[in-house]
Amino acid sequence: MNALARRAAGLLLSTVLLPLSALAADQQPTHEFRLDNGLKVIVREDHRAPVVVSQVWYKVGSSYETPGKTGLSHALEHMMFKGSNKVGPGEASLILRDLGAQENAFTSDDYTAYYQVLARDRLGVAFELEADRMASLRLPPEEFKREIEVIKEERRLRTDDQPMSKAFELFSAMAYPSSGYHTPTIGWMVDLERMSVGELRACYEEWYAPNNATLVVVGDVTPDEVKALAQRYFGQVAKREVPVAKVPLELPTPGERLLKIHV
């Protein structure tokens, strides 16, 4: 490599690394604390734009479910948008949309999470809505009757009609014969067909407690601001006894397992 090429390469490298080093220098520390009711709060400051991301993570997911009751965590995620003490079905989403916010939720093997992205001065609205459904979810039977059909159609579209998704589902069932990782997050269709509001209510009351949740806020905020808002809204939610989650265990491998899929 000649001198000109080395100089050009060095300039290119410095151009790439300089923004990264500046970003590393600007990173703010992560703050963590708990409310008296056990809610864990994590705050990460990022003042580049007047925006915040607010997330509530519950320590429950499809791996917590038992045979015959699969899909409860995912179905409950859907029903969390169907009304609580302060708002009716879908009203929380309309409030957030009018504020220009984005929201969504997702369920996995070990957790269920809900989040909003919105202006920093609207964080209290997100907290109020999230705390309300943590404390007083309604679960109207008529809403469940409609929503379970949406979930079943979601399963048909994303799993039953998708060879790769179906193959992975069967692979997981074979790879984890003993633990909760055996079952798909959306649940088996036979369990969706017989799911009841009572089962969802039991799941909600068991796991959706402040002492089984983590509130994460990242954005243009300070820890003191978040702590004050969290105490104002989430601090009023009563702590509840939460079951001890079983550690996922698998039996010793009995030997070679073979899965054949014909498509």
Regions found by a protein language model. Give the residues of each.
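Short pre-active-site segment immediately N-terminal to the catalytic Zn-binding motif
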Residues: G61-K69
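Active-site SXXK
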Residues: T70-S84
